[in-house]
UniProtKB/Swiss-Prot annotation:
Free-text note on domains in this protein's UniProt record: Has four distinct domains: an N-terminal nucleotidyltransferase (NT) domain responsible for UTase activity, a central HD domain that encodes UR activity, and two C-terminal ACT domains that seem to have a role in glutamine sensing.
Protein name: Bifunctional uridylyltransferase/uridylyl-removing enzyme
Record CDD domains: ACT_ACR-UUR-like_2, ACT_UUR-like_1, NT_GlnE_GlnD_like
Enzyme Commission no: 2.7.7.59, 3.1.4.-
GO molecular function: [protein-PII] uridylyltransferase activity; phosphoric diester hydrolase activity
Role according to the record: Modifies, by uridylylation and deuridylylation, the PII regulatory proteins (GlnB and homologs), in response to the nitrogen status of the cell that GlnD senses through the glutamine level. Under low glutamine levels, catalyzes the conversion of the PII proteins and UTP to PII-UMP and PPi, while under higher glutamine levels, GlnD hydrolyzes PII-UMP to PII and UMP (deuridylylation). Thus, controls uridylylation state and activity of the PII proteins, and plays an important role in the regulation of nitrogen fixation and metabolism.
Catalytic reaction list: [protein-PII]-L-tyrosine + UTP = [protein-PII]-uridylyl-L-tyrosine + diphosphate; [protein-PII]-uridylyl-L-tyrosine + H2O = [protein-PII]-L-tyrosine + UMP + H(+)
Obligatory cofactor(s): Mg(2+)
Record flagged with keyword Transcription regulation: no
Domain (ACT) ranges: 740-822, 850-927
Regulation: Uridylyltransferase (UTase) activity is inhibited by glutamine, while glutamine activates uridylyl-removing (UR) activity.
Residue intervals of the HD domain: 499-622
Keyword set, alphabetical order: Hydrolase, Magnesium, Multifunctional enzyme, Nitrogen fixation, Nucleotidyltransferase, Repeat, Transferase
């Protein structure tokens, strides 16, 4: 075990009195002599009580010293002693060995994570019972006695019984068994038997197979990352198996142990794998991750490995994090977590470089293929520079001092790799990280360094290169504002990645937009081709910086604009372009907000938006930035509906900005929409097509994407042919994780409230709604609800129940308030706190009062809101329903019962108060009978 174990072993021993407990077990054996079952039960009860007490003591110490590795060592030591006590009891009181024949020998060995000498509170125990030959009755009885007692104590135990020969044979053919034996640790029994296994394993399995083992372990690591999500910046990480988590550290040590034959981690420095600083980083990362994992297990009471939102805040408090202006305690904790994950990745790269030097790890597949196809020298100078070489198709330094003699090389290396399509040699990245101190004010102001950086940002594969710059620390040191958001998470369910990862991904999506050919980016790609050439760099830097001021007390859009005004002149931007970048950052949320939460058929909405964007060129740039930003939030956030909303907002606003001129005017867009719809239904009679097109208002044809229009038309036609007064169609969106209910019914003032109430009574949470009324007074509403079941069949049955309830309410068979009161169950406490906000505005529309509510989402919220609005004697003309993770943002265009705006301050105040109470969940609001 490591030196830390030795250092704290006395402290552990003082808290677990093995001699006292052994004496108590002996007393139980004497008391229950001749009654084996009674003895086993009493012994299990005694040891379970001692284990509970020891765990409680370990948790108390952990909360005090916050040293996770020591806690894991304490827990492991306690478990070791319990197994030794059990072995002693089994061999002295239950199954005494007959006259030793040589066969009645056994070594009890810890394997897996337990073999490392570290245990989380709820971890499994892995044991190997080693026998000299085949299984004997005595060996089977002893192993069973130990195992049954452990199971009676409520422990999860993995076990195997093998001879030395069997262990060696299986280790040769099974990499999992090989890894388990690699980590064995002797507990009790026959030490020479264990020593024989270790010696033979080293000679017969390990020797000459280093490359095979390394390749297998790195492949396992890649597959594990692929299954869990490739990014180490996913905001609910798995502390055991996630990227940059404990399993990566374990893999690193397995490889080092196998290749360098080390037993303890401190030997990694002696063998030259790490220098002293890197070893300290290794220990610091391990201790932090063990602290998190042990606290997770203790707090949850189970083997919980995922840092889910509902656990993050509690773990942050247990680890002593506090809130700072602009950053919550939980956000500071998670930033630390992701910084550690990044360092784990760096350590893995360092080990891989060392292994390649010693040929234990094969060169990357691409490099081997290139070598076969192009038999050039393995190392050559990089074109355009004498300071770097190409080593196996990867860029490396030509001399140890290339960064010291010219610090611009810290930027140049990334540009050269990008320009010549080279991978990065781990040694070069190690040298870069060690040279970060050279990135000072002088280098930041260096024109050549800034020119190279802008070339990196605006050239192919910018996302890949920027990510490497970020992982090495160069990006955060060169642009210090970016350094402040490295590994920063936002404590919400909307953003899937840390802020820095989100920004880098957005740049990648911007490049996808520029390349074109992707249908979901069609509008943005078209606009990208039409912006002024000098504004190409503007949109790239704005995309990289739009969230750079997150985590500050000030609004991040305003603070980010200030960052841009300071930074852009240094990067070579003119005053006018600097101001344009600042404007884009300050307004980067505006277009998304207007498109998703305003009535785009209302002239005032368009005029207000036009006043913000000021020019067609600025609107083009803002549309492109908005598209990349939404797409970069995470999977399922961007969809065809949002793309169509942005398209509609853009083309509705263009004539206002140009005095009536539009590259694609409204009439032409309507004609094109009709034409593509007709093409999709060429088999329909012409008069039926004309009649269907006439049933929808222009806003429908301009705002709804074609695939949805096609589904609507088929659904409406089949419903009417079947004579249904009310029809419901069910669809599933796997990417967004929602079930879509499309309702076709006679329009009704309470229809939205009825739909929302039916969903609430079924426990279905509405995440967005698309609401349309036809010219002949029919409602065509699509409601998206969060999935509850994995199987589509189960989701379909739930949707059918909702539809039947809507029909029963409309026909007067059910009173919705009673159904909702009977069936709606308040959702469990959520980890998020969002202050409810209600805004009432008469400037966003000339005809309607616009009510915007925002707060913590929950099942039944839309029903409560629409019911409250109806009780306030307001008519809902249109509703715009959306959720952003855990935040609901619903906008209602309303009038009073006479069709007028709400102007009286006292009336507005009453509306605001009532809806604030609803958002806060103060009381259930019931509709009028």
């Amino acid at each position: 075990m490591d030196s830390v174990t030795t250092e704290h072993k006395q402290e552990v021993d003082d808290r677990f009195d093995t001699a006292r407990i052994t004496a108590a077990v002996d007393a139980l054996a004497e008391k229950h002599q001749g009654r084996e079952d009674a003895f086993r039960t009493a012994m299990a009860q005694l040891l379970k009580a001692e284990l509970i007490a020891a765990r409680a003591a370990a948790q108390a110490i952990l909360l005090k010293d916050r040293h996770g590795r020591r806690c894991a060592e304490r827990l492991c030591h306690v478990q070791d002693e319990i197994i030794r006590i059990l072995y002693s009891a089994a061999t002295r009181h239950l199954y005494r060995s007959p006259i030793p024949s040589g066969a009645e020998r056994m070594a009890v060995v810890a394997t897996g994570g337990y073999g490392r000498g570290l245990m989380a509170p709820e971890s499994d125990i892995d044991l190997l019972f080693i026998l000299p030959y085949k299984q004997t009755a005595w060996g089977e009885q002893v192993a069973e006695a130990i195992l049954y007692c452990l199971w009676d104590m409520g422990l999860k135990v993995g076990h195997a019984t093998r001879s030395v020969d069997e262990s060696i044979r299986q280790a040769r053919g099974d990499m999992t068994i090989r890894t388990a034996i690699l980590e064995t640790r002797f507990l009790t029994g026959d030490q020479p038997l264990y020593d024989e296994l270790v010696e033979r394993f080293d000679k017969e399995v390990v020797q000459g197979t280093a490359s095979e083992f390394v390749t297998a372990k790195l492949a396992e690591r890649e597959e594990r990352h692929r299954r869990g999500g490739q990014s180490r910046y996913l905001v609910e990480p798995n502390v055991k198996d996630g990227k940059g988590a404990l399993r990566d550290l374990h893999t690193l040590f397995w490889i080092a142990k196998y290749v360098y034959r080390v037993r303890d981690t401190d030997e990694l420095v002696e063998r030259g794998v790490f220098d002293a600083q890197e070893y300290r980083t290794f220990r610091r990362c391990a201790d932090f991750l063990w602290s998190v994992r042990c606290n997770l297990h203790f707090y949850s009471g189970r083997a919980e490995e995922r840092l889910s939102f509902d656990l993050q805040r509690e773990i942050a408090v247990r680890l002593g994090y506090t809130s700072h202006p602009g950053m919550q305690d939980v956000e500071r904790f998670m930033k630390h977590y992701f910084l550690v994950a990044k360092e784990v990745g760096n350590l893995t790269a360092i080990l891989c470089a060392k292994l390649e030097d010693q040929q234990a790890k094969p060169a990357p597949v691409l490099s081997r293929m290139m070598a076969r196809l192009r038999p050039t020298p393995a190392k050559r100078r990089v074109p355009d520079s004498d300071d770097f070489i190409v080593d196996n198709n990867r860029i490396n330094v030509a001399a140890p001092d290339v960064f010291k003699h010219d610090p611009v090389n810290l930027i140049r290396i990334f540009r050269l790799a990008q320009k010549h399509n080279l991978a990065f040699h781990p040694d070069a990245m190690r040298d870069v990280t060690r040279s970060l101190g050279l990135i000072n004010a002088q280098l930041r102001e260096n024109p050549e360094a800034n020119r190279l950086f802008m070339e990196i940002l605006t050239s192919d594969n910018a996302e890949i290169v920027l990510r490497r710059m970020n992982e090495t620390g160069v990006l955060g040191h060169f642009i210090r504002a970016f350094g402040k958001i490295v590994s920063m998470m936002q404590f919400n369910m909307y953003h899937h990645y840390t802020v820095d990862e989100h920004l880098i991904r957005c740049v990648g999506f911007l490049q996808d937009i520029e390349r074109g050919g992707i249908e979901e980016f069609a509008v943005a790609s078209d606009l990208m081709r039409k912006i002024r050439p000098e504004h190409r760099s503007v949109i790239y830097i704005a995309t990289l910086l739009h969230d750079v001021a997150k985590g500050r007390p000030e609004d991040h859009s305003i603070a980010g604009a200030k960052v841009a005004r300071r930074l852009c002149p240094r990067l070579g931007f003119s005053p006018a372009d600097t101001e344009l970048v600042a404007w884009l950052i300050e307004e980067h949320l505006t277009m998304s907000t207007v498109a998703q939460s305003r009535d785009l058929s209302d002239r005032k909405t368009i005029e207000n938006f036009a006043a913000v964007v000021q020019s067609v060129e600025q609107m083009k740039l803002l549309t492109i930035l908005t598209t990349a930003d939404i797409r970069g939030v995470g999977p399922g956030v961007w969809n065809g509906w949002k793309a169509q909303l942005l398209r509609s907002l853009y083309y509705e606003t263009e004539p206002v900005l140009t005095g009536g001129f539009s590259e694609v005017d409204r009439g032409k867009r309507l004609t094109a929409a009709y034409a593509e719809f007709r093409n999709a239904f060429a088999e329909w009679p012409a008069d039926e097509l004309d009649a269907y097109i006439a049933r929808h208002y222009p806003a429908y044809w301009l705002k709804v994407e074609l695939p949805r229009k096609i589904r609507h038309a088929r659904f409406v036609r089949s419903s009417e042919q079947a004579g249904h007064k009310l029809a419901i169609n069910v669809g599933f969106d796997e990417v967004r994780g929602v079930t879509e209910l499309t309702i076709f019914a006679a329009d009704h003032p309470w229809l939205l409230s009825i739909i929302a109430g039916a969903c609430a009574s079924a426990g279905a949470n509405i995440v967005d709604a698309q609401i349309y009324t036809t010219t002949d007074g029919r409602a065509l509403d699509t409601i998206s609800i969060s999935r509850e079941y994995d199987r589509d069949e189960d989701e379909g049955r739930r949707a059918t129940r909702i539809g039947e309830m809507i029909e029963d309410v409309l026909e007067g068979k059910l009173r919705l308030p009673e159904v909702v009161a009977r069936r709606t169950v308040r959702s469990k406490a959520r980890p998020f706190v969002i202050e409810p906000e209600v805004t009432i505005n008469n400037q966003w529309s000339d005809r309607y009062t616009v009510i915007e509510v925002s707060g913590l989402d929950r099942p039944g919220l839309l029903y409560e809101l629409t019911t409250a609005i109806s009780k306030l004697n307001l008519n809902i003309a249109s509703a715009h329903v959306a959720t952003f993770g855990e935040r609901a943002r619903d906008v209602f265009y309303v009038t009073d019962l006479l069709g007028a705006q709400i102007n009286a301050p006292t009336r507005q105040s009453a509306i605001k108060s009532a809806l604030t109470h609803v958002m806060a969940g103060d009381k259930a609001v019931q509709p009028a009978a």
